[in-house]
């Protein structure tokens, strides 16, 4: 599938608002739902073509959609495999997919068929951003390498999520969240001296997705100055190694090392939510003022000037003793009693929420964190809104699309005739839910 070079006529969108010093001010979250429907959002006018699947790329493009970008999800005829994970009301619309792909449009293309290039060429030509997580051999076979895409559209930002950087010996290896948690040291740290353990969420996928978002926005800032696009590679392994080493490198920042790796406080076996009389409480007694207030609160004022605990350096050296002391104190009273006393003394603390507790959290309720919608296909639903609002008001997002829900709409926008769309649908190059009136 060859792509002819296409230098698109740029839409009248000024991306100088991303240049430092020229940014629009970020508005507060607006409760006025009418304003939310009509006000422009930070990325309005940005077109994103997203070939990625699973978690990492879709999480990145979901955030772009939440900030107002027009995200077009390109799916194979069978759809993204994540569609089929978890409980569902309708086939192919599982909860993870619903969350990660809200606000996007879906076009179904069989990229292995040469005819699909009739849609792919203009789609890439009108894109501001292209996202994919193809392995190098696959992107080469589909002619979707960064060089291919940039040759076709020199102004596009092409974000390629990789398992491993392409210049190293691991290039081209398959990678998933578990693999990268293991390779990056995250699983080892979770094991805390025992058998390694995975973090019980797709941490690497989501962290790398956020790094991809930052890389895309940085490339758009540069494009605002130069007018040129670029290939941005976001490797999972290198990203997570950097993420872990920030505080875990320890004495190994020196060459030769001046001590052990790791961060003593986070490695303490006593660092965990503390049992109370009726549950658990997370407490972060950190500064000199925090510890003084805590010792006074529990009647241990003799420890305030104890040389083992009078400075952050010494407390870190004796952190196991301190955490054990806190644990022994907290077990005697209820979570609510402790939290009230700690809040009065400005000591950071929070009860331990389950996932379902979040839906009843009074703070999240007060900030309208959950958007409740009545979807005509799925019925009543609730979504977590964007935690950060860019622009004057949050956008009202499209519902999560079914496979190829917008194929015909997008093909028409790209200038294909009704007859040609009908032919491409008949031969299987385009997949769509609607075929009426195409031939």
Sequence positions of predicted segments:
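Mid-to-C-terminal alpha-helical segments outside catalytic/metal-binding sites
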Residues: 2-18
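N-terminal helix-loop segment corresponding to the beta1-alpha1 unit
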Residues: 18-225, 402, 408-439
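Glycine-rich beta-alpha junction loops
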Residues: 78, 163-165, 236-241, 278-280, ...
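Conserved Rossmann-fold dehydrogenase catalytic segment
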Residues: 166, 193-203, 224-240, 260-266, ...
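Mid-domain beta-loop-alpha active-site segment that forms a flexible
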Residues: 202-217, 236-244, 286, 290
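Oxidoreductase and adenylate-handling cofactor-binding alpha/beta cores
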Residues: 209-229, 242-252, 295-301
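Aromatic-enriched alpha-helical interface/lid elements that frame and gate functional surfaces
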Residues: 269-345, 349
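A glycine-rich dinucleotide-binding beta-alpha-beta segment and adjacent secondary-structure elements
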Residues: 344-397
């Amino acid at each position: 599938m060859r792509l002819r070079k296409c230098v698109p006529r740029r839409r009248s969108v000024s991306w100088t608002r991303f240049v430092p010093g020229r940014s629009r001010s970020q508005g507060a979250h607006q409760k006025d739902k009418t304003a939310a429907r009509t006000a422009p959002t930070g990325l309005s006018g940005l077109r994103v073509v997203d070939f990625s699947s699973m978690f990492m790329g879709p999480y990145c493009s979901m955030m772009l959609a939440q900030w107002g970008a027009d995200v077009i999800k390109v799916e194979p005829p069978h759809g993204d495999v994540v569609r089929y994970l978890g409980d569902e009301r309708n086939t192919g619309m599982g909860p993870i997919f619903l969350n990660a792909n809200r606000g996007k449009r879906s076009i179904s293309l069989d990229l292995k068929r040469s005819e699909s290039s009739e849609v792919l060429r203009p789609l890439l030509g009108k894109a501001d951003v292209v996202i994919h997580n193809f392995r190098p051999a696959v992107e080469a076979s589909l002619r979707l390498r960064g060089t291919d895409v940039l040759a076709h559209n020199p102004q596009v930002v092409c974000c390629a999520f990789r398992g491993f950087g392409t210049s190293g010996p691991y290039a081209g290896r398959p990678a998933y969240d578990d693999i990268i948690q293991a390779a990056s040291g995250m699983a080892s740290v979770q094991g805390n001296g025992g058998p390694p353990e995975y973090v019980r969420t797709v941490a690497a996928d989501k962290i790398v997705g956020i790094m991809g978002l930052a890389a895309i926005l940085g490339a758009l800032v540069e494009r605002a100055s130069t007018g040129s696009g670029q290939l941005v590679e976001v490797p999972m392994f290198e990203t997570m190694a950097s993420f872990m080493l920030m505080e875990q490198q320890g004495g190994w920042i020196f060459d030769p090392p001046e001590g052990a790796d790791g961060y003593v406080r986070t490695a303490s076996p006593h660092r965990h939510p503390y049992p109370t009389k009726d549950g658990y409480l997370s407490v972060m007694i950190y500064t000199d003022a925090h510890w003084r207030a805590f010792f006074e609160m529990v009647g241990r004022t003799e420890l305030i000037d104890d040389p083992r605990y009078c400075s952050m350096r010494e407390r870190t050296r004796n952190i196991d003793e301190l955490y054990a002391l806190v644990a022994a104190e907290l077990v005697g009273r209820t979570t609510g009693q402790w939290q009230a006393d700690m809040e009065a003394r400005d000591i950071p603390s929070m009860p331990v929420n389950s996932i379902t507790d979040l839906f009843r959290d009074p703070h999240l309720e007060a900030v309208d964190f959950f958007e409740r919608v009545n979807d005509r296909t799925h019925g009543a639903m609730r979504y977590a809104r964007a935690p950060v609002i860019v622009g004057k008001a949050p956008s009202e997002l499209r519902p999560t699309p079914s496979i190829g829900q917008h194929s015909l709409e997008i093909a028409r926008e790209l200038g294909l005739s009704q007859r040609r769309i009908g032919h491409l649908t008949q031969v299987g190059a385009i997949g769509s839910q609607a075929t009426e009136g195409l031939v």
